[in-house]
Structures are given as structure tokens and as C-alpha cells.
Regions:
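Accessory N-terminal region flanking or inserted into the helicase ATPase core
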Residues: 1-34, 38, 42-43, 60-62, ...
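Active-site signature of alpha/beta-hydrolase-fold catalytic machinery across serine-
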Residues: 46-50, 206, 245
Length: 277
């Protein structure tokens, strides 16, 4: 197994100075600014290989992406780098590299058997779910706000639901400000539970909330030593809360994002910066 702990050792693997610096950075929170073609996947792969070569169990590594296609790409890149560094490609099966929604589904299912009975709705299936229950959810009452346009009303209701769940807003406060919208959101929540469906926004919100209060969820998350997140500029409020809690439980956090000035840190933790482009 070749040593790949230092920047010079990583440079010898063919990484640029910027990539090597990011892969070797041992800070507990690192933001890697990356643009197209800057080699972010290569940097992620070598960072994973580095921490494994230094003794981190593969089971303690979680890499979050936002699409299955991106997850597959990173898995292939990591496997190639592991072999190049004299490590086994089979380690891929011991770590988690995948979407944040699948990760949350695994965490919830392990912590509470009831969630294994739920059918997960991606965004498209959630839209179809709302369409199938349009009359009984009181959505018709909102149509006059959107000139009686069915699909625009539906899209706005789904957007309101996602904001409500992503940002952890209070349903009581929404109801006090806008009773019609509040009632629709409350009905959606009750129907989803009754029908044993879990939409993407609710899945992450449930995981983020339980990560703060549920001992079994916290125990599961505390086993993570290194968390890597791709496309960090796109995370929602609930996703950021979950990432922050995992960091508070002891994991280092390495995130890759574009040059977005809104990315500065979370809940008191500020990023060290690496620049790939």
C-alpha cells in the first residue's frame, strides 16, 4: 500500500497542487470550491483513499450525492483510486456512497421498523400522489389564487409543502398566517401517514429531527468519522441541519460546492477553504 497522507505524496499520484491540498487537509470542516472540469471527483476519491490508508474503517465513511448517476460515478472513481493505491476495491461495499434520500431511508429504517413499511415518493411520484387526492386535500380552495389553473395550483402547493418540511417551519404559525394553506399542508401530512407514504422532503426532515433527539439515530450517526458532500450549494435547510448534527457527533465534514457566497458554514462551524478552480 502506497502512502498518500501528505500533499507531496498526493502530487506524486498525479493530482494538481490544489487537488492535493484539498485531499490532504485534515481540518474538521473543509469547503472545496470546484468548477466544471476541476477534478472534484478525483479529489473526493483520493481524500477517501487517504483516510482509509491512515486507518479509518471504510464503514465509517459516508459520501453524499444528489443523484444516483453522480453516486455511481464517484463509486467507480473511488474503486479505481483504491486499487491504484494498493487497497481493495471491495472496500466500496463497506462505505456508503449514494444519495442523501437513500441514506436517510436507511437510517430511519434501522431506527424504527415502521419506516420499512412506508413507500418512498420521489418528486414525480409525490406530484402524482397529490393529483390523485386533489379534491380531498382542499387544494381546490386555493385555485382562485392562481387564476383557477390546476397545474399551477398543484405546483405551488407542492412547493409550499417542500419549503415547510425543508425549513422545519411551524404548522401552527403557517395556519395562523394563512389558514387555507395551513389546512392543506396539515391534510397532506395526515394523508401521507395514513397511506404510509414518505416523500423526499419529509424523509430528510424526519431524519434531521431524530438526529437531535433519538438515541438510536444518534448512535448510528456517531459511527461516521468522515462525511463528504457533493454539490453542497444545493442542500436544503433540513439537509444542512443533518450534516451539522453529524459533524457535532464527531465526523469531519468535507463539502464540494460552487463559488456561492452563501456557503460559509453551519451552526457555528466555519469552513476551511480549498480552491480547485
Amino acid at each position: 500500500m502506497r502512502k498518500i497522507s501528505t500533499e507531496n505524496e498526493l502530487r506524486a499520484e498525479g493530482l494538481t497542487a490544489e487537488q492535493a491540498a484539498a485531499a490532504a487537509d485534515t481540518s474538521s470542516t473543509v469547503l472545496c470550491i470546484a468548477c466544471a472540469g476541476s477534478g472534484k471527483s478525483q479529489t473526493l476519491a483520493y481524500r477517501i483513499a487517504r483516510v482509509i490508508s491512515e486507518g479509518t474503517p471504510a464503514t465509517a465513511i459516508v459520501a453524499i450525492t444528489f443523484t444516483e448517476k453522480a453516486a455511481d460515478s464517484i463509486k467507480r472513481r473511488v474503486a479505481k483510486v483504491l486499487v491504484r493505491c494498493g487497497l481493495s476495491a471491495n472496500l466500496i461495499g463497506q462505505m456508503y456512497i449514494g444519495t442523501i434520500h437513500a441514506f436517510c431511508q436507511n437510517v430511519l429504517g434501522d431506527s424504527d421498523a415502521i419506516f420499512r413499511q412506508y413507500d418512498v415518493l420521489d418528486d414525480n411520484r409525490f406530484t402524482l400522489y397529490l393529483m390523485s387526492r386533489y379534491p380531498e386535500l382542499g387544494i381546490n380552495a386555493l385555485k382562485p389564487r392562481f387564476k383557477d389553473r390546476y397545474f399551477e395550483t398543484l405546483a405551488q402547493v407542492q412547493h409550499a409543502w417542500n419549503v415547510y418540511r425543508d425549513e422545519g417551519l411551524s404548522l401552527k404559525e403557517i395556519e395562523s398566517r394563512d389558514p387555507q394553506v395551513g389546512n392543506v399542508l396539515k391534510d397532506i401530512g395526515q394523508r401521507l401517514i395514513r397511506d404510509q407514504f414518505l416523500d423526499f422532503s419529509s424523509m430528510v426532515r424526519e431524519t434531521a429531527d431524530r438526529a437531535r433527539t433519538d438515541a438510536s439515530v444518534r448512535a448510528r450517526l456517531s459511527r461516521i468519522q468522515h462525511l463528504l458532500v457533493d454539490e453542497y450549494q444545493d442542500v436544503s435547510g433540513s439537509q444542512e441541519e443533518l450534516i451539522a448534527t453529524i459533524h457535532e457527533l464527531g465526523a469531519s465534514v468535507f463539502v464540494v460546492g460552487d463559488d456561492d457566497q452563501s456557503i460559509y458554514g453551519f451552526r457555528g462551524a466555519r469552513f476551511e477553504y480549498s480552491q480547485l478552480c
